[in-house]
Regions:
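Gly/Ala-rich phosphate-binding loop of Rossmann-like dinucleotide-binding domains
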Residues: 31, 35, 222
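Glycine-rich active-site loop/strand segments that organize a redox cofactor
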Residues: 56-124, 144
Length: 288
């Protein structure tokens, strides 16, 4: 079974007991996919699934967000970013010092070839993901949550649009469908916007959901109806032995699965650290 296949699988391979740590949309989607691959899956979260970051996000289902942050133009803008003269990023100097090796490697990937390779990989992943979401949304009977109409990036100056040319070239190389609008056309399609934008790019195939929490709830319901288990408990420990994993829980009995998936968002690095992984994980600001 390829990842993202929405069909249930009775299984050609041996079923395994799997614990998913984290009940956001990523953890829930992992739970559904693994369950349909024939495995016995338990989803663990300290709160009701979908009530952390997955509750307050924009609900965008994109197949066009393929330009990674360490792009060829980042090095030129680095002095401005480091001196705090940009509203687009805030960072912790202490974090950067502690992760200097990782930061230098991150910057070493600011080349055109590596940026293009990352774009191709993201395009393949996002296209598959969008198709899967549409299939699961239909299966869950929550088509009313799905919103078509694309996603618009508005640019205030002609210069900023020209600087965006690299993103559009990457989109062209990967078959992303988009439309470019001038100032007057933008006012026609988005009359509520202030008249401060000179250009806009509409990514036509992008869609979204009106209520991300409701979508997560619908996926969880499918998971439970198919025999999945949801535990509301805090993960207090994680260790690996000869016979499998041990997951310590506060609020429920400990678990002993064959495999563990860590999908705990901003808390994933801490949990992974319990078993020896040192992940230089960063995260964006909270949404709510």
């Amino acid at each position: 079974m390829r990842p993202g296949d929405g069909n249930r699988v009775t299984g050609d391979s041996m079923s395994r007991r799997i614990v998913i740590v984290g009940g956001g949309i990523v953890g829930v989607c992992n739970a559904l996919a693994l369950q349909r691959a024939g495995h016995s899956v338990t989803l663990v979260d300290r709160t009701t699934p979908g009530r952390e970051t997955s509750y307050g996000n924009a609900g965008v289902l994109s197949e066009s967000s393929i330009g990674v942050l360490n792009n060829p133009g980042l090095l030129a803008s680095l002095p401005k970013l480091l001196m705090g003269r940009s509203n687009s990023v805030r960072f912790s100097p202490l974090f950067m010092v502690r992760r200097l090796g990782w930061m230098l490697k991150f910057l070493s990937y600011c080349t055109t070839s590596r940026w293009q390779a990352a774009g191709r990989a993201l395009r393949a992943l996002q296209t598959l993901s969008l198709d899967q979401h549409k299939a699961w949304i239909a299966e869950a009977g929550v088509d009313d949550l799905l919103r078509y109409g694309g996603w618009t990036k508005a640019l205030r100056t002609t210069e900023s649009f020209e600087a965006y040319a690299g993103e559009l070239a990457l989109a062209d190389e990967n078959g992303v469908v988009y439309s470019v609008f001038d100032e007057s056309q933008l006012r026609q399609i988005e009359p509520g916007l202030k008249p401060i934008y000179k250009k806009a790019v509409l990514y036509d195939e992008t869609c979204g959901v009106s209520n991300p929490a409701a979508l997560t709830d619908a996926y969880v319901a499918m998971f439970v109806e198919s025999g999945g288990t949801v535990l509301q408990a805090s993960v207090s420990g994680l260790s690996q032995g000869e016979s499998g994993w041990h997951v310590g829980l506060d609020g429920a009995d400990d678990l002993s699965p064959d495999d563990v998936v860590i999908a705990a968002g901003a808390w994933s690095a801490e949990i992974a650290g319990w078993v020896g992984y040192d992940l230089p994980l960063g995260w964006e600001r909270g949404y709510h």
